């Protein structure tokens, strides 16, 4: 039975990691069903095993189509791909069968989202080594999703307690990140981040651009990247009509955003934004992938092989990712 709540697809991730466990725990929470209709994409055998690890007793409703879902607390609605030999699965270990299965869960989720069966997807952890062992030639979720949706350059946003953070650079050295702070790149990201916010239905407020150097360079005393690149980019963006301010010192900009002065912050390098969000609330820092024709949220932790199978993994991040997907999906513009 389908109601008017958003339908959120949840691929269960690497079946040898904590993904199945955090999903099972999440679906014991009434809040999830109050805000959305969750559907798992995975393997019934893996879910049953995860329930055993977590000492959780839920019914499994294996379905072929979304409209067969019950969407009631106490029942897991599952698209069962039946693609794992549970006797061969080694919990907490890198293995090709797990990587291949995880990829198939993602692929099915994307297909359903592209066909309009899902309003968004909330993804669970996968393992890069297991993908490689399974001959899946991607390094992670974002690359898989980009390829499956024909998206050239997806944009990552973190959200925690209402604070949104974008990243000018991500997985590059700090030295290279400084070299990538150019007027052209900063302007491009201001435009793209503004468009991403609009797609999510965020229309009020201004974006802030963080400074790179101490005190945003102090007029060139501590570095000139702000004077040469950041300020000219912001001024040009303002002339184009974009609501943006900065550069604002990184020691205060996140505090100001959290207080509501800004609707988002453009962080200039990986750790600048990661430290701010994860110090605020590590478990509730959720990644939102923008720029694709589908909406995707994700936990920001890994497969945690060291505790997989113990039932110890916290589901706080997973619950938050599902709820955030439900929050944005009614406003999301493809």
Curated annotation (Swiss-Prot):
Catalytic activity, EC: 1.1.1.408
Catalytic activity: 4-O-phospho-D-threonate + NAD(+) = dihydroxyacetone phosphate + CO2 + NADH
Cofactor(s) the record lists: a divalent metal cation
Binding residues annotated for a divalent metal cation, in chain numbering: 171, 215, 270
Chain residues that bind substrate: 141-142, 278, 296
Cofactor note as given: Binds 1 divalent metal cation per subunit.
InterPro entries membership: PdxA_fam
Family affiliation: Belongs to the PdxA family. PdxA2 subfamily.
PANTHER family: 4-HYDROXYTHREONINE-4-PHOSPHATE DEHYDROGENASE (PTHR30004), D-THREONATE 4-PHOSPHATE DEHYDROGENASE (PTHR30004:SF6)
Name this protein carries in UniProt: Putative D-threonate 4-phosphate dehydrogenase
Organism (species): Clostridium botulinum (strain 657 / Type Ba4)
């Amino acid at each position: 039975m389908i109601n008017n709540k958003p339908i959120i697809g949840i691929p269960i991730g690497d079946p040898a990691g904590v993904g199945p466990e955090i999903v099972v725990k999440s679906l014991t929470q009434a809040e999830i069903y109050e805000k959305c209709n969750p559907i798992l994409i995975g393997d019934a055998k893996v879910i049953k095993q995860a329930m055993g690890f977590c000492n959780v007793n839920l019914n499994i409703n294996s379905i072929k189509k979304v409209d067969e879902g019950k969407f009631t607390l106490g029942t897991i609605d599952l698209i069962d791909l039946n693609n794992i030999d549970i006797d061969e699965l080694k919990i907490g270990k890198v293995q090709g069968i797990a990587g291949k299965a995880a990829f198939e869960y993602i692929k099915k989720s994307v297909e359903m989202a592209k066909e309009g069966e899902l309003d968004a997807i909330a993804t669970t952890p996968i393992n890069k080594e297991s993908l490689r062992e399974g001959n899946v030639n991607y390094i992670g979720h974002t690359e898989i999703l980009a390829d499956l949706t024909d998206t050239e350059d997806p944009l990552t946003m973190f959200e925690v307690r209402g604070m949104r953070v974008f990243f000018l650079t991500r997985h590059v050295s700090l030295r290279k990140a400084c070299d990538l702070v150019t007027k052209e790149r900063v302007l491009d990201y201001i435009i793209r981040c503004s468009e991403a916010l609009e797609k999510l239905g965020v229309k009020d407020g201004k974006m802030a651009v963080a400074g790179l150097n101490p005190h945003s360079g102090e007029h060139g005393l501590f570095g000139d990247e702000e004077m040469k690149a950041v300020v000219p980019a912001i001024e040009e963006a303002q002339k184009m009509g974009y609501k943006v301010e900065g550069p604002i010192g990184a020691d205060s900009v996140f505090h100001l955003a959290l207080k509501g002065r800004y609707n988002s912050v453009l962080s200039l390098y990986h750790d600048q934004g990661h430290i701010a969000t994860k110090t605020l609330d590590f478990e509730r820092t959720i990644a939102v992938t923008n720029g694709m024709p589908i909406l995707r949220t994700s936990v920001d932790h890994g497969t945690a092989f060291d505790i997989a199978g113990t039932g110890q993994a916290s589901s706080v991040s997973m619950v938050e990712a599902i709820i955030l997907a439900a929050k944005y999906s009614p406003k999301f513009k493809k």
